[in-house]
């Protein structure tokens, strides 16, 4: 079962973010104080089940207290084409990891990552190696800011 933001905000410690993809799944982790998101590379296992296993293992290895999975939304707020696959993936991660897993809107994260990589002149193979992790990092930093607001309310 997936968790809400209040449940994740109530946990203490490092948060993991995931940008689930069919080819690569980007990963990022926060510091224990939840102020800074840092990209942590990507995984390339095939399919939802293998990706969920790899993410649950990475969360355990890095000591994550909660996991955030990007939810692809259209600009009008409706679910994107991959939303159902991402929900299935997030549900599997929740079961396998035993951690609170929430989904968060990932609109424009890949666009923001692409713009950053364009501005820093990262191209070709190097770009493919970092874009998914950078997208997860953007998802996580946005989530950290939202969770900090919940903690102050």
What annotation goes with each model-predicted range?
Residues 1-18, 23-153:
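Phosphate- and other anionic-substrate recognition elements at nucleic-acid/protein interfaces
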